[in-house]
Amino acid sequence: METLASRIDPTSPAFAENEAAQRALVADLRQRLAVAALGGPEKSRQRHLARGKLLPRDRIDTLLDPGSPFLEIAPLAANGLYQDASPGAGIIAGIGLVHGRPVLVLSNDATVKGGTYYPMTVKKHLRAQEIALENRLPCVYLVDSGGAFLPMQDDVFPDRDHFGRIFSNQARMSAAKIPQIASVMGSCTAGGAYVPAMSDETVIVRNQGTQAICGIPAADIRAWL
């Protein structure tokens, strides 16, 4: 077999220009990833911690085997959308190891609009479920969500890959005997309550976790008039 020799000249001006351009792109990517990893604004993160809660990435670190890798899925989902109000689409998804077994982890980020679902949050959740279905990965849901982001509910529900498909996928996984375990870690309403309700096992954190179809303000018809 013929050997393909490189003709790149690392001392040429063109090489230096291309290298500088690529390094700038890599630096920009790393900056975007770092910003998305922070989650919501500082005020929201401090309020979350003041309630005695772990930040979502700390929850994942505590769950996974010490020192094991975490393959994150779509960390830049919703980047540049919604006036950058939903970093990472408000949910962390990825594959990690629990007792040496690969699992799909989905963790709502309550520091981002109370963990509510923007349209891209739904798409990211669905993509993670597709990966779990295709690879028969057990799912661990770290739930801390107020359900759909109501100001954008007209974009959350109307298409084929809408909010309701999350629960359809859960039913399909249940039928396929793919384990689903949920931990309710905050005030979870509407869609945030359905996910743990449709899981095989659910753990509710004492003095933190609650489930409800909706809150009193949403149930008050006067709020909609």
Regions found by a protein language model. Give the residues of each.
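Loop/turn elements at helix/coil->beta-strand transitions in domains of secreted/extracellular proteins
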Residues: 136-138, 179
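Hydrophobic alpha-helical segments characteristic of transmembrane helices
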Residues: 55, 132-136, 143
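Glycine-rich active-site/cofactor-binding loop and its immediate structural neighborhood
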Residues: 85-130, 134-135
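Short beta-strand segments at enzyme active-site cores
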Residues: 105-106, 138-144
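Conserved catalytic cores of soluble enzyme domains
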Residues: 143-225
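Amphipathic alpha-helical transducer elements in NTP-driven molecular machines
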Residues: 26, 119-126, 163, 195
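N-terminal amphipathic, basic-rich helices that act as targeting or association modules
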Residues: 1-99
